Amino acid sequence: MVMEYLVLEKRLKRLREVLEKRQKDLIVFADNVKNEHNFSAIVRTCDAVGVLYLYYYHAEGKKAKINEGITQGSHKWVFIEKVDNPVQKLLEFKNRGFQIVATWLSKESVNFREVDYTKPTVLVVGNELQGVSPEIVEIADKKIVIPMYGMAQSLNVSVATGIILYEAQRQREEKGMYSRPSLSEEEIQKILKKWAYEDVIKERKRTLSTS
């Protein structure tokens, strides 16, 4: 019992450390990303960078499939929400002061490094073939590209998401945004209780199944 308490206390400390570095104003929106491997890789990168919220839209209304072999459990620590009207949702974020940054290849697009990701940001990445929908591009504040010097004009969507998010992380680290929680203490406690409960319940079920 004492050992179980010590393990739980250590786990809670780790969960809190993670929450204190979560960036609640750096959000990812996956627009019709259909491949579960790509989507799962995006989830894992979100967790690694400190993204707390990942929204997605599926043109066929399907729920996103998670490949746990790829996420390695990281999907438990990112809030993943399905959206039925992507434009409406993104406009809601704009009204809250977020900049909408969409990956899009055009003459108006800028190098992804030229964007200030320390501002409240929603990064929109698109479908593997068509990219981000024109309706979303129209309302985007920034359209970005990753410089390419080979024959291919684009990267895999999960790779591109990772590159952009790590630039956002670099900028935010330089500004000290990972050194202070973006979540309030009330928000931390609320999420911590949810995470801890789900984590402990799953661990106990695993222990019982192997005993």
UniProtKB/Swiss-Prot annotation:
Superkingdom of the source species: Bacteria
Gene Ontology biological-process entries: tRNA guanine ribose methylation
Entry EC number(s): 2.1.1.34
Pfam families: SpoU_methylas_C (PF12105), SpoU_methylase (PF00588)
Catalytic reactions on record: guanosine(18) in tRNA + S-adenosyl-L-methionine = 2'-O-methylguanosine(18) in tRNA + S-adenosyl-L-homocysteine + H(+)
InterPro entries from the UniProt entry: Alpha/beta_knot_MTases, rRNA_MeTrfase_SpoU_C, SpoU_MeTrfase, TrmH, tRNA_m1G_MTases_N
Record-level Gene Ontology MF annotations: tRNA (guanine(18)-2'-O)-methyltransferase activity; tRNA binding
UniProt keyword annotations, A-Z: Methyltransferase, RNA-binding, S-adenosyl-L-methionine, Transferase, tRNA processing, tRNA-binding
Keyword match tRNA-binding: yes
Binding-site list for S-adenosyl-L-methionine: 103, 146, 155
Entry-linked CDD domains: SpoU-like_TrmH (cd18092)
Alphabetized SUPFAM superfamilies for the sequence: alpha/beta knot
Subunit structure: Homodimer.
General function of this protein: Catalyzes the 2'-O methylation of guanosine at position 18 in tRNA. Type II methylase, which methylates only a subset of tRNA species.
PANTHER family documented for this protein: RRNA METHYLASE-LIKE, TRNA_RRNA METHYLTRANSFERASE SPOU TYPE DOMAIN-CONTAINING PROTEIN
Family membership noted in the UniProt record: Belongs to the class IV-like SAM-binding methyltransferase superfamily. RNA methyltransferase TrmH family.
Name listed for the protein in its UniProt record: tRNA (guanosine(18)-2'-O)-methyltransferase
